[in-house]
Curated annotation (Swiss-Prot):
The lineage of its organism: Eukaryota, Fungi, Dikarya, Ascomycota, Saccharomycotina. It comes from Candida albicans (strain SC5314 / ATCC MYA-2876). Belongs to the TIM16/PAM16 family. Pfam families: Pam16. Residues 53-107 are annotated as: J-like. This is Mitochondrial import inner membrane translocase subunit TIM16.
Length: 121
């Protein structure tokens, strides 16, 4: 009787684990395919940060997002947070990565706009 119960528990656990594994694999494959469809993957490696966070760091609104504004805010915040002013390298790196992320986003948006313009001609 105990053997039958133990075997039943093992088979039930294995089937639950198998279903969870296949569902996780399906979700990962779907996310991978969506990421490869053109939009750059979320910037999460090598210091990259999400666009929304980068805009908060540089205190920018979506409506005022331009390369000039990004560089202006970057210069100001980078200099204010310099080690010579008694501030931290950590804050400077956050400001730098925010600027880098927004520059990449602006390049991507410009590329999309150019492709749409070329497609409509």
């Amino acid at each position: 009787m105990a053997h039958r119960l133990l075997v039943n528990v093992i088979f039930t656990g294995a089937s639950v684990f198998g279903r969870a594994f296949t569902e996780a694999y399906r979700q990962a494959a779907k996310a991978s395919a969506a990421g490869a469809a053109g939009r750059p993957a979320k910037a999460s490696s090598a210091g990259g940060i999400p666009v929304e966070e980068a805009m908060k760091i540089l205190d920018l609104e979506k409506s005022e997002l331009s390369l000039d504004k990004v560089e202006e805010k970057y210069e100001y915040l980078f200099n204010v947070n310099s080690k010579e002013q008694g501030n931290s390298f950590y804050l400077q790196s956050k400001v730098y990565y925010a600027m880098d992320t927004l520059k990449k986003e602006l390049e991507y948006l410009e590329k999309l706009q150019n492709e749409k313009g070329a497609a409509s001609n």
